[in-house]
């Protein structure tokens, strides 16, 4: 049988009719699902830009001598500069900033105005708490099938300082570790964390950041995280751990003091249990749960923490 060739019926008339004059290129429009962006911390916070912090927010002062504090924008910029200097040659991304606990005020000229008559220019704001994450995506590794990028995290909370005194060294928290790109969970190790960083100027803050980066051993941190995947627990053991975590708050004070502090709240513990069943990446309902997945269930629940306690709960001891 001869090969059958089907020719367009109008092929011979194509040149004469010049349909191209009337035809347009087809445009295929595809509806792509919009996925909400993951953040390293989510609940109780809102996104903020560096421009907003610099130009729309006032800077708190120490009330007894009217000395300026190091504001959130200066904190972010200083650590960003330190990261770009230390990791020269790597791609250092701009900070992802989250803030909470807005403090509102008004300018002196608007003191006697009713609240419903205030103009935007009459109002002042600043945020009591701020946190940021700076990723270095060119430094990465895979652990448990998850890509981890090097990440620097800073936390500042004015509520942990006495602003009614004279100027004293100011408290900051700074960490360097890895961010799980699957869920943006932060993985922090003790060697990469300064929980009581007190400085009086941005130059001191800059030097402290460089010192932290220099002392951090990413290879050791990655090795410890990789080892988590070598140990597993049964569903029964997981249920026992969750149950004992819930019992902790009910223990007499003497019993609690003899145990390591339970920093997770009951709500967060419930989130861990729910994620064990439903989480697509780290859930293991009906099967064994390795420690890497368990760790990510815990850090995932931690994303609902308040900013001032966030880094403490992300820590691997």
Placement of each model-derived feature along the sequence:
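Feature for intrinsically disordered/low-complexity regulatory segments and propeptides
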Residues: 1-80, 87, 91, 98
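Histidine (H) residue identity feature
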Residues: 39, 51-55, 72, 101, ...
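A short acidic/basic microdomain associated with nuclease active sites
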Residues: 85-124, 129-131
